[in-house]
Design a protein with these regions (language model features):
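Short, solvent-exposed aromatic-acidic interface loops
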Residues: 14, 65, 89-92
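Extracellular carbohydrate recognition and processing domains
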Residues: 83-103
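Hydrophobic/aromatic beta-strand segments within beta-rich folds
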Residues: 32, 47-51, 57-62, 99-121, ...
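Short proline/glycine-enriched turn/loop motifs at strand-loop junctions of beta-rich domains
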Residues: 55, 65-68
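Disordered, acidic Ser/Thr/Pro-rich linker "stalks" and the adjacent N-terminal cap
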Residues: 1-52, 134-137
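Flexible, active-site-proximal loop/turn residues at the rims of small-molecule/cofactor binding pockets
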Residues: 66, 118, 135
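Short, surface-exposed beta-strand/strand-loop-strand elements in extracellular ectodomains
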Residues: 67-84
Length: 137
């Protein structure tokens, strides 16, 4: 099992609802702890990670800031038909980063969509998303 969401593993951000030249969405998958994606201040916000092939997702970990409600969705092809696999309300962490973990059996996916439905402030940030799993053979 390894991190399927790293850009060096071939993962790509194929959609993000906001982008800033200083804090682009690709920062979430660059493997660095100090970089991040910043949202533009309206909700909902979302991003989609495309994996290099069909994968089995075992767990997802998100390091973020100011997120209140989040939804994780997957699909196994290039359609827009996503299936919700988790919804959660995060606790406010004041000035500390939020680290949230999600565990699954084996969830098959080609794409992972993360929908930030609301936040504790106008802006939120995602520092890192880790997707542990294996390629489907």
């Amino acid at each position: 099992m390894f991190d399927l969401a790293l850009s060096e593993a071939g993962a790509q951000i194929i959609l993000a609802t906001s982008s800033d030249d200083k804090y682009p969405p690709e920062h979430m998958i660059d493997g660095k702890d100090e970089t991040f994606w910043a949202t533009c201040g309206l909700y909902p916000q979302e991003f989609v990670i495309r994996f290099t092939s069909l994968v089995n997702i075992n767990s997802v970990s998100i390091t973020c800031y100011n997120i209140r409600d989040i939804k994780l969705e997957v699909n196994s092809d290039d359609s827009q038909n996503f299936k919700t696999i988790e919804q959660k309300e995060f606790q406010s962490s004041d000035s500390a980063p939020q680290i949230e973990d999600f565990s699954f059996g084996n969830v098959k996916a080609q794409n992972l969509r993360v929908v930030i439905e609301s936040g504790y402030d106008h802006f939120c940030a995602v520092y890192k998303i880790t997707v542990n799993g294996t390629a489907v053979h």
